[in-house]
């Protein structure tokens, strides 16, 4: 990709490419022929904005372009994770060829039941295009939904179900959550939003979903919380 940057006028940066070359883009010397960089998504933390501004390179993103696709994945993970579907599938595959298959299934299936979502509480951090969709879907599943977003737009607010409860601070939200999902861009101010301090506020056994940016979660704090049972595995 870096070699091609010297020969094109527009660079389209997809999420897949970001995973394999974000550092390269931040440190790349752009040719004078480069006019614009388009980010397929909302976050632009993988693009050197100051340098692009100095060189007159237009940078634009496409927030919400894949919002529905991501929201569906979040809901899928919410259901499958809570009901232990991945573990159950792996276990079932291990029964292949068993002479006592029906008996084995009947005996072992209860270990994968997992909690139902209806009546449980989910906290949604960030109520933009993706977070709002996740919140509304969770309402439809019969969950109690708490929302936290100090920068929520008017359009996003109008799109939310009336059933979504507004939390002024994370301290108001976290102690009540059985599930927690985060949907904010990566900025210096949002780095490690989920950390040892915020996890300590949560219920024991909280389930955490992050389909936004890895940098939003302190991995060491998360590993510790998984080890103690503060966060469900």
Language-model region placement:
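An N-terminal-biased, well-structured beta-alpha scaffold segment characteristic
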Residues: 1-60, 195
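Glycine-rich Rossmann-fold phosphate-binding loop(s) that bind the pyrophosphate
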Residues: 127-128
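Structural alpha-helical scaffold elements that stabilize or flank donor/cofactor-binding regions
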Residues: 2-5, 30, 116, 172-176, ...
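N-terminal Rossmann-fold NAD(P) dinucleotide-binding loop
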Residues: 131-132
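Phosphate-binding beta-alpha-beta segment of Rossmann-like dinucleotide-binding domains, i.e.
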Residues: 63-121
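Aromatic pocket-lining residues of Rossmann-like dinucleotide-binding sites
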Residues: 137-138, 202
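Rossmann-like adenosine-cofactor binding region
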Residues: 16-23, 146, 150-233
């Amino acid at each position: 990709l870096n070699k091609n940057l010297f020969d094109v006028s527009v660079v389209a940066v997809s999420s897949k490419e970001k995973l394999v070359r974000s550092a390269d883009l931040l440190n790349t010397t752009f040719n004078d022929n480069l006019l614009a960089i388009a980010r397929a998504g909302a976050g632009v933390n993988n693009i050197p904005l100051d340098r692009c501004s100095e060189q007159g390179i237009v940078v634009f993103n496409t927030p919400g372009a894949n919002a529905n696709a991501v929201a569906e994945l979040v809901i899928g993970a919410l259901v499958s994770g809570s009901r232990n579907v991945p573990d159950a599938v792996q276990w079932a595959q291990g029964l292949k060829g068993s002479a006592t298959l029906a008996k084995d299934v009947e005996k072992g299936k209860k270990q994968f039941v997992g909690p139902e979502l209806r009546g449980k509480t989910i906290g949604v951090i960030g109520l933009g295009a993706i977070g709002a969709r996740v919140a509304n879907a969770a309402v439809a599943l019969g969950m109690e939904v708490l929302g936290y977003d100090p920068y929520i737009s008017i359009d996003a607010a109008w799109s939310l179900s009336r059933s979504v409860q507004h939390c002024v601070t994370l301290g108001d939200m976290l102690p009540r959550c059985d599930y927690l999902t985060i949907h904010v861009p990566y900025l210096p101010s949002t780095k490690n939003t989920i950390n040892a301090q915020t996890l300590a506020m949560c219920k024991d056994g909280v389930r955490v979903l992050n389909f936004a940016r890895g940098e939003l979660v302190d991995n060491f704090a998360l590993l510790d919380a998984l080890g103690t049972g503060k966060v469900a595995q």
